[in-house]
């Protein structure tokens, strides 16, 4: 973290620098003009994590500044949503005088939504007892007069949910509202307003699609649920069980009837498609019945593994969302042999950092 770089007056210049850097990095692929989707310059992060410093009777949040090589007190945090900032102040005022709630507390995590819900996770270097549970329940009751809040306590091999361990986000995407269950300690898009722009872009580039869609690494169904409207059917894979469970909830709450989620890794699915292995999890699913002309991938920072990349290359159209331009560039060295980049986008999920979220649509040459 570099707090000095977080200056809204420099946001436009920083975004321009990112665009230029991205264009130069991918010039060899003869990409079309970069479509740039800006973030809000402040209060854009829907989640934040803070360490907690104890100093006598005082108690405060802090982060580590790599430039200063020191901890920095954070009574407020410019990137975090307005809701998180409001909760930060209200929560610390409650924690300071309460021995049971502050004793050996070392971290606080916040997960907020545009829909107004917020989840607070309190992390401890001690086991949590009945007194903690009682005090935490009273804390939740007091905070509930101002917030739609849930509280979780965590310690080594211990997790206490006072109510539920998730929030439900509502995103207005074009003329539709999509609802997403977001589970504590699971991946969610951190910048909700940019996430909306990503969904709208993905919907736009897949308009008038033929056949079915295959999605790898689908998470909680964020993209596949929004894209289902553009395809006859959608088949999606995800390995993490909490994400699969959330995806099933999201399919139901959004009334999506043409989306099937399979719990397996991209590598396993590649083997299944190549008929190298059979999987009990695929019983009742006829993979051969799907006519997937389009594949959607949103891989982890490491990019797509060689076997899966070969699978991906077999589709007419490839929609690739990347959180790491370096591994995207590596993957494009192979994909560019058979496909051409026809749409290219920069999504500024993480202002004031070097991080660049990118999207490319590739179509067979």
From Swiss-Prot:
Q: Which interval of the chain is the signal sequence?
A: none
Q: What is its EC number?
A: 2.1.1.-, 2.1.1.35
| One Gene Ontology molecular-function label | tRNA binding
* Keywords, in A-Z order: Methyltransferase, S-adenosyl-L-methionine, Transferase, tRNA processing
Matches recorded under Pfam families: tRNA_U5-meth_tr
According to its UniProt entry, the protein's GO biological process terms are: tRNA methylation
Positions of S-adenosyl-L-methionine binding? 189, 217, 222, 238, 298
Catalytic function, reaction form? uridine(54) in tRNA + S-adenosyl-L-methionine = 5-methyluridine(54) in tRNA + S-adenosyl-L-homocysteine + H(+); uridine(341) in tmRNA + S-adenosyl-L-methionine = 5-methyluridine(341) in tmRNA + S-adenosyl-L-homocysteine + H(+)
Naming one, the record's GO cellular component terms include:
cytosol
Q: Where is the active site?
A: 323, 357
Q: Answer whether the UniProt record assigns the keyword S-adenosyl-L-methionine to this protein.
A: yes
Q: Which domain of life is it from?
A: Bacteria
Entry function: Dual-specificity methyltransferase that catalyzes the formation of 5-methyluridine at position 54 (m5U54) in all tRNAs, and that of position 341 (m5U341) in tmRNA (transfer-mRNA).
PANTHER family listed in its UniProt record: TRNA/TMRNA (URACIL-C(5))-METHYLTRANSFERASE, TRNA_TMRNA (URACIL-C(5))-METHYLTRANSFERASE
Per the record, the similarity remark reads: Belongs to the class I-like SAM-binding methyltransferase superfamily. RNA M5U methyltransferase family. TrmA subfamily.
| Name of the molecule in the record | tRNA/tmRNA (uracil-C(5))-methyltransferase
Q: What is the lineage of its organism?
A: Bacteria, Pseudomonadati, Pseudomonadota, Gammaproteobacteria, Alteromonadales
Q: Which gene encodes it?
A: trmA
């Amino acid at each position: 973290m570099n707090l000095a770089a977080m200056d809204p007056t420099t946001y436009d210049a920083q975004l321009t620098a990112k665009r230029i850097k991205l264009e130069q990095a991918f010039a060899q692929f003869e990409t079309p003009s970069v479509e740039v989707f800006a973030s809000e310059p402040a209060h854009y992060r829907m989640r934040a994590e803070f360490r907690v410093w104890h100093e006598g009777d005082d108690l405060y949040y802090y982060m580590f500044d790599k430039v200063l090589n020191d901890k920095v007190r954070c009574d407020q945090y410019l990137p975090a949503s307005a809701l998180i900032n409001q909760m930060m102040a209200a929560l610390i005022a409650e924690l300071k005088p309460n021995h049971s709630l502050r004793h050996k507390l070392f971290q606080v995590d916040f997960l907020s939504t545009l829909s107004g819900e917020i989840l607070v996770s309190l992390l401890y270097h001690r086991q949590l007892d009945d007194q903690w549970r009682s005090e935490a329940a009273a804390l939740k009751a007091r905070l509930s007069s101002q917030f739609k809040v849930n509280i979780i306590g965590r310690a080594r091999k211990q997790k206490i949910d006072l109510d539920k361990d998730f929030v439900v986000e509502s995103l207005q995407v074009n003329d539709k509202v999509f609802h997403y269950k977001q589970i504590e300690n699971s991946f969610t898009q951190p910048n909700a307003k940019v996430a909306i722009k990503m969904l709208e872009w993905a919907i736009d580039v897949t308009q008038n699609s033929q056949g079915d869609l295959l999605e790898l690494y689908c998470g909680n169904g964020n993209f596949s649920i929004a894209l289902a409207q553009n395809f006859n059917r959608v088949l999606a894979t995800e390995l993490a069980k909490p994400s699969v469970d959330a995806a099933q909830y999201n399919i139901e709450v959004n009334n999506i009837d043409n989306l099937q989620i399979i719990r397996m890794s991209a590598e396993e699915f590649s083997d299944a498609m190549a008929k190298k292995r059979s999987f009990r999890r695929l019983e009742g699913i006829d993979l051969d019945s799907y006519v997937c002309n389009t594949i959607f991938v949103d891989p982890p920072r490491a990019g797509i593994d060689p076997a899966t990349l070969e699978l991906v290359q077999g589709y007419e159209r490839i929609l690739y969302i990347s959180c790491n331009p370096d591994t995207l560039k590596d993957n494009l060295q192979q994909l560019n042999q058979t496909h051409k980049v026809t749409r290219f986008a920069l999504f500024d999920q993480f202002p004031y950092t070097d991080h660049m979220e990118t999207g490319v649509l590739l179509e067979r040459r």
